Design a protein with these regions (language model features):
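A short acidic, leucine-rich amphipathic alpha-helix
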Residues: 25-29
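Short alpha-helical segments that sit at the start of domains
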Residues: 1-11
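Residues that mark the N-terminal boundary/hinge immediately upstream of a DNA-recognition element
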Residues: 22-23, 62
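Basic, amphipathic "hinge/linker" alpha-helix immediately C-terminal to the N-terminal HTH DNA-binding motif
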Residues: 57-72
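Amphipathic alpha-helical dimerization/coiled-coil segments
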Residues: 74-88
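A short, conserved structural fragment
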Residues: 45-54
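Short capping segments at the starts of secondary-structure elements
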Residues: 16-22
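Short amphipathic alpha-helical interaction segments
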Residues: 31-46
Length: 88
């Protein structure tokens, strides 16, 4: 896997946390080091894209985070379609 953009990393984290999961699972699913993950988690929580649930000690993607994921996926599909159209 090559270098990923910050938006791709954010999307990986939000996708992994959709429905709620632990920090360790997010780290493995998003292919991030512990330090990288902590940096991103702070940013995502500050911006209300992710929430920490004390009772279960899990992270969960918020409604705002789900909207971000939806837009990111739509843009990705649009770019993929544009690339395919240009190659034909």
């Amino acid at each position: 896997m090559g270098n990923r953009s910050r938006t791709e990393i954010v999307s990986s984290i939000l996708d992994a946390a959709n429905g709620g999961t632990t920090k360790t699972k997010i780290m493995y699913i998003a292919f991030l080091s512990y330090n990288q993950l902590n940096e991103y988690l702070s940013i995502l929580i500050e911006n209300n894209l992710l929430e920490y649930l004390d009772g279960t000690k899990t992270f969960k993607t918020t409604e705002k985070g789900l909207n971000y994921l939806k837009m990111h996926n739509e843009i990705g599909e649009l770019l993929q379609q544009t690339t395919m159209d240009n190659n034909n």
